[in-house]
């Protein structure tokens, strides 16, 4: 996966405009938190324990992130994160009910209490956190908005898409970002908005659009299943946004947010420390290990779970690196490079706050 660094400077010009737009709309959005869709604040963990299963919102089928195979098993980075949370909360990573959602339905499902946590390629933004009364638990995957074109088109850069029609998925940040970028660069791009990622991909492959836009990693997974094979399509090098994809929970349940956040931190810290699904039991018994990874009874009680929850998390799905390689990296059909999702010691952005 290519570096997103160039996108940072290109997207800076949109920041002031975006903030102004967010603030102008904030009164309406905050008021919306009181509507019937907004579930009453409560102890999500207690409800999960009473139910005996974690209800996790995922995509309707984005390979590498969350997709159900013919046997009915869900796989992908997001699906594995759901299992990690279930392992911490319920003691068993298999106690998950996966709830497939279109992008436009994900926040109503979370706010209305249909799901306990959302792990569905969701970008962490100020507008969403402040306006929708949700909380993001940390970045699970760093991405950026990109473009895919047919290889035979010989389009090599975004500038060559001037005046083109581009397919996008409804209910995502993609359409808005593309509109801003098109105006700022005078590209005159027109969007064809489809109800789901699958429909957007079908329209693109049917030549209804000259390009398809979305998170670059998602485009890479879509390309693998493309008619004519992956080699028939090219992902352009430009990125026009930063897309930190993060698990989401409802606001006003800080205890649940803390548990979900530190499940993610355990996965990241375990990779840095060389703790894997195979050696976790031995390594986590090492008294020299950072104190928090031993999960003292005092800390575990504060989180509302059992003392060995970090061990259960890693034994259930492996560390972050294992999850990445299995679902998106060299052990997958997509062969994505770690890029920004590498450990901080390897030039990436992934690291955990201290556990002490």
Per-range role (PLM):
Residues 38, 80-83, 87-89, 152-155, ...:
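Extended ligand-binding regions for polar small-molecule ligands
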Residues 49-53, 86-91, 111-115, 152, ...:
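Sec-exported extracytoplasmic/periplasmic mature domains
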Residues 2-22:
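Bacterial N-terminal signal peptides that target proteins for export
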Residues 17-36:
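Bacterial N-terminal signal peptides
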Residues 55-64, 74-89, 123, 143-199:
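Bilobed "Venus flytrap"/periplasmic-binding protein-like clamshell domains
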Residues 37-121, 296, 303-305, 310, ...:
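Extracytoplasmic small-molecule ligand-binding "clamshell" domains
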């Amino acid at each position: 996966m290519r570096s997103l660094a160039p996108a940072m400077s290109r997207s800076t010009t949109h920041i002031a405009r975006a903030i102004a737009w967010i603030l102008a709309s904030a009164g309406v959005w905050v008021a919306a938190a009181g509507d019937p869709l907004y579930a009453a604040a409560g102890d999500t963990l207690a409800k999960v324990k009473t139910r005996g299963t974690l209800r996790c919102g995922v995509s309707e089928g984005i390979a590498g992130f969350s997709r159900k195979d013919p046997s009915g098993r869900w796989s992908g980075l997001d699906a594995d994160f759901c299992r990690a949370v279930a392992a911490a909360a319920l003691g068993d990573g298999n106690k998950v009910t996966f709830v497939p959602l279109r992008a436009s339905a994900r926040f109503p499902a979370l706010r209305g209490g249909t799901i306990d946590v959302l792990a569905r390629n969701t970008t962490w933004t100020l507008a969403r956190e402040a306006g929708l009364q949700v909380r993001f638990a940390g970045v699970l995957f760093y991405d950026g908005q990109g473009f895919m074109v047919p290889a035979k088109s010989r389009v090599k850069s975004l500038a060559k898409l001037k005046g083109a029609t581009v397919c996008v998925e409804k209910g995502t940040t993609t359409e808005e970002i593309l509109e801003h970028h098109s105006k700022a660069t005078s590209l005159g791009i027109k969007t064809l908005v489809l109800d789901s990622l699958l429909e957007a991909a079908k329209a693109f492959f049917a030549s209804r659009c000259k390009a398809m836009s979305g998170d670059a990693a998602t485009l890479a997974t879509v390309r693998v299943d493309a008619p004519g094979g992956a080699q028939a399509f090219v992902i352009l090098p430009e990125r026009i946004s930063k897309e930190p994809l993060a698990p989401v929970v409802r606001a006003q349940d800080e205890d649940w947010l803390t548990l979900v956040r530190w499940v993610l931190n355990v996965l990241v810290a375990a990779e840095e420390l060389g703790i894997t699904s195979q050696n976790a039991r031995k390594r986590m018994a090492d008294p020299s290990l950072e104190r928090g990874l031993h999960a003292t009874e005092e800390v575990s009680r504060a989180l509302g779970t059992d003392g060995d929850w970090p061990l259960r998390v890693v034994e259930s799905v492996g560390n972050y690196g294992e999850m990445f390689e299995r679902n998106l990296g060299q052990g997958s059909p997509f062969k994505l490079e770690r890029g920004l999702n590498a450990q901080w010691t390897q030039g990436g952005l992934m690291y955990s706050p201290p556990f002490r």
